[in-house]
From Swiss-Prot:
Coiled coil: none
An example molecular function term from Gene Ontology annotations: metal ion binding
Reported function: Involved in fosfomycin biosynthesis. Catalyzes the hydrolysis of cytidylyl (S)-2-hydroxypropylphosphonate ((S)-HPP-CMP) to give (S)-2-hydroxypropylphosphonate ((S)-HPP) and CMP. Can also hydrolyze (R)-HPP-CMP and cytidylyl 2-hydroxyethylphosphonate (HEP-CMP), which is a biosynthetic intermediate before C-methylation, but the catalytic efficiency is much higher with (S)-HPP-CMP.
Name of the protein this chain belongs to: Cytidylyl-2-hydroxypropylphosphonate hydrolase
Annotated family: Belongs to the FomD family.
GO biological process terms on file: antibiotic biosynthetic process
Keywords: Antibiotic biosynthesis, Cobalt, Hydrolase, Manganese, Metal-binding
Name of encoding gene: fomD
Cofactor requirements of the protein: Mn(2+); Co(2+)
């Protein structure tokens, strides 16, 4: 059984509306509904629609308010596909141009391996990101300084910080060698008709 299935729930069906959340201090820091594209031992893929409602946990949190809270309670960018290989400490976001819808870049979000819950998936962002433009294998590291500051002030233990750095470095090497685990054809994936409708919450939409 994969780590993403560790709590014993069954795989979610294609099109199911589930909760995707970051959990901090034992409670949701941010959560939002997504639609399931794939849920297998090798791949979990979910779609976040433009305009989806974002729900933020009530302060105080040890890391402060979630940074997305500055931008309101809706996902304002184009819809995105999030790809996760169970057990790995990152997900890959397929980012598109907001105006044209054209594939723009792979955005590797370093985070805790997704943990399956009865309502969806739980993780926690680890700050470091890798950005790979559509026309290049050349990647750009992002927010390393933020991660190192969190490590310095104790938001990550020394062991956790070492593991996070290693995960980011492993993904960077895989990309540079053209050996990334995800299928690049996902850059051409389009959501089915009706999936761009606004999602308010996983409870109401998934019932």
């Amino acid at each position: 059984m994969t780590e993403a299935a560790s709590e014993g729930t069954e795989s979610f069906a294609f099109g199911a509306v589930v909760e995707r959340r970051d959990e901090l201090d034992g409670r949701p820091w941010i959560s939002y509904p997504v639609r399931v594209v794939a849920d297998t031992p090798e791949l979990v893929a979910v779609h976040l629609s433009h305009g989806t409602r974002l729900t933020f946990g009530d302060d105080p949190f040890s890391w402060g308010p979630h940074p997305w809270q500055l931008f309101g309670d809706r996902w304002q960018s184009a819809g995105i596909l999030q790809l996760h290989r169970p057990g790995r400490g990152h997900s890959v976001w397929v980012l598109r141009d907001a105006d044209t819808g054209a594939f723009r870049e792979w955005y590797v979000n370093v985070e805790a391996p997704w943990r399956r819950t009865p309502t969806g998936f739980s993780t926690l962002d680890h700050e470091i990101d890798l950005v790979v433009p559509a026309d290049s294998r050349t990647l750009r590291w992002k927010d390393v300084e933020k991660f190192e500051e969190r490590a310095r002030i104790g938001h990550f233990s020394p062991e956790e910080a070492t593991a996070i750095r290693a995960e980011a470095a492993d993904v960077a090497r895989e990309i540079a060698a053209g050996e990334q685990w995800w299928d690049t054809r996902w850059s051409r994936w389009e959501p089915p008709a009706g999936w761009n409708a606004l999602l308010q919450s996983f409870e109401t939409e998934g019932s």
